[in-house]
Every structure is written in C-alpha cells, then in structure tokens.
C-alpha cells in the first residue's frame, strides 16, 4: 500500500502541476507586464535610438513558476501521506516520528521558497535584476534553516554527525548544527546561481528526487518517499514548460524551494551528508563562481581562473546549445545519484 501512496502522490503532482502551468503562464505574464509598462514608458523612443541599434528582443518567459511546484507538491504530499497512513496507521505513532520529519522537511522547503518569492517580487517591482540585497537574502535563508534545525532538535531528530566512507560515523558534537546551517544556506545560493539557464534546476532536481526515493528505501525510510515522489511527478510536469526554450521559469521561488527539498529531506532522516553528492550539479555551479571570485580578488582583478562562470555559462561559451547544456547537467545529476546510492550502501 505504501507503493500505491507513492504512485498516487507522483501522479497527482504531475497532473496538478501541468494544470496549474496552463493557468499560471497567462496570469504571471499579465502580472509582470503591469510592472514592465512603467519601465517601457521611460525607455527611449525609436526616433531617439541609433540607426544600428539592436533589434527588439522577444519577451522573456514569465518567472515565479515555482509557485506551481509548491502548490502541486503540497496537494500531492497531503493525498499521498493520507493514503500511506490509512494503509499503515502505525506511521502516525511510530517512534521514528515519520510525520514530524515529513512536515519539518516540507516546512523547510516552503520557507526557502518564501525567501525566493520575496526576491522575485523585489526583482519585478524594482529596476534591479539582483532582487534582494545579499545580506538580507542570506539572513532570511539562515533564518529558514534555523527553524528547521530547531524543530528537529526539539523532537530529538537532529543528526549529530556524519558517516564517512572507510571511517564510519563521526560525531561532530556542537559543530553539527552549524555545519547543517551552512550546508542549507550554501545549497540555496548554489541553486539560485544554477537558475540562470532554462531547465537546469528542474531537470537535475528531478533526477535527484528519483535517486532520493531509492536511497530512502535502502535506509529504511520508504514511507517518507511520498515527499520526493510527489516532487518528482511535479517536476516532470513542469519540464513541459521549463525545457529550453522555456515558456515558464522557476524563478528564485522555485529554485530555492527545490534547494530546500534537497537539503531538508536528507537532514530530516538523519543523513544530511547525502546532500553533498545528491546536489552535485548545484555544488559545481556555486563552486565555480566562488573560485572565480577568490582568484579575482586575490589577484586584484588581474586574473580569472575560468573564462566564464558558473558552469553553464562556461559550457555556453564553448559552443553548446541550451539543450546540450541541459543534457550535460542531467548526466552530472545521474552521476551524483550514483554516488549517493553507493554512499548509502557502504555506510
């Protein structure tokens, strides 16, 4: 019956997100158009433009499509978890606190998605493409991560160490919450960077959710697979809109929501270290940017480590199309899933 719950969650997530996509595309385009009109009035008239001015670019796809994912996942998880609890009522009173772990992971993802929503709104309403100020965004992300850690700590579900291949379990003591906090915030920033190319975050997260379902089965957390199953179904539907060239973009609300899922779900089952291989494409994206900045600052702007950063921009400069970059990142995501499964097997 648990398998039926997972199938129901993924199926509902797919159809609900697909339906919401049809509804959200015109609504978001109209919403963003309201804020684009004042900017268009301030733009120079065609008579004032130079004769060799660039031709007008086609309108960009609407953003904030991550709202479709959030609504679809909430409904699908609700139905799937209800079906699982009806099939196995002991899940509600289990000593492993299945319901607490599931709700905490879901809340954490929604909190990170809320931070992304604020940034999208700030980006749309203002003329700045950066959205929220960096310190404001990092503070909100840290607060979202702290809420998750406090809830898990109060219920005694917070992992105090990590499992290293060949070493075994290593107790981190008081440093564990600080490490998990840094992990969640860093993952959110990396996912935000990866959202610069159509389909990357959506496609890689889909592969990660499939891998996470398998890993949770290996580790004995099969009932909580309802959460990644629902998200996998929703992501499959959203790819209909987000595959390059995108008709609807995730936006920061979607990318941070997915980062919250990738970080909070392993953390809530006591295996936060699985996030490292599971989110491999995101770490590569953020890692390239971090290295580029460090080298540039160390050389006082005279040297760059890479021709361009992050990874998807570097691949773009090497002549790869958007579709090729999408498939490249999917291969990297599958490699991360394989590493995650191996880590779960040997731990």
Report residues per predicted region.
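Final/C-terminal transmembrane alpha-helix of multipass membrane proteins
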Residues: 322-343
């Amino acid at each position: 019956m648990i398998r039926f719950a997972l199938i129901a969650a993924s199926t509902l997530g797919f159809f609900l997100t697909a339906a919401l996509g049809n509804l959200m595309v015109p609504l978001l385009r109209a919403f963003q158009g309201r804020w684009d009109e004042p900017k268009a009035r301030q733009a120079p008239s065609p008579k004032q433009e130079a004769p060799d001015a660039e031709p007008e670019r086609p309108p960009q796809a609407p953003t904030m499509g991550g709202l479709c994912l959030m609504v679809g996942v909430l409904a699908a998880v609700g139905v799937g978890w209800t079906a699982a609890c009806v099939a196995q009522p002991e899940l509600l009173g289990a000593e492993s606190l299945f319901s607490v772990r599931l709700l905490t992971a879901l809340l954490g993802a929604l909190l990170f998605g809320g931070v992304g929503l604020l940034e999208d709104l700030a980006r749309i309403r203002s003329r700045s493409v950066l959205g929220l100020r960096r310190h404001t965004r990092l503070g909100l992300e840290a607060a979202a991560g702290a809420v998750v850690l406090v809830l898990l700590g109060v219920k005694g579900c917070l992992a105090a160490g990590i499992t290293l291949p060949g070493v075994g379990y290593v107790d981190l003591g008081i440093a564990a919450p600080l490490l998990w906090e840094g992990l969640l915030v860093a993952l959110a920033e990396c996912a935000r960077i990866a959202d610069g190319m159509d389909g990357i975050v959506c496609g890689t997260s889909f592969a990660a959710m499939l891998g996470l379902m398998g890993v949770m089965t290996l580790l004995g957390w099969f009932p909580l697979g309802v959460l990644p199953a629902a998200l996998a179904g929703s992501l499959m539907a959203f790819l209909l809109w987000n595959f390059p060239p995108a008709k609807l973009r995730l936006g920061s609300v979607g990318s941070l929501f997915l980062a919250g899922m990738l970080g909070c779900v392993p953390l809530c089952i006591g295996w936060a270290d699985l996030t490292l291989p599971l989110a491999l494409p995101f770490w590569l994206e953020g890692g390239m940017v971090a290295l580029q900045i460090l080298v540039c600052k160390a050389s006082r702007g005279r040297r760059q480590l890479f021709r361009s950063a992050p990874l998807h921009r570097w691949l773009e400069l090497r002549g790869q199309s958007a579709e090729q970059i999408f498939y490249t990142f999917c291969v990297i995501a599958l490699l991360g899933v394989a590493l995650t499964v191996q880590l779960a097997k040997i731990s």
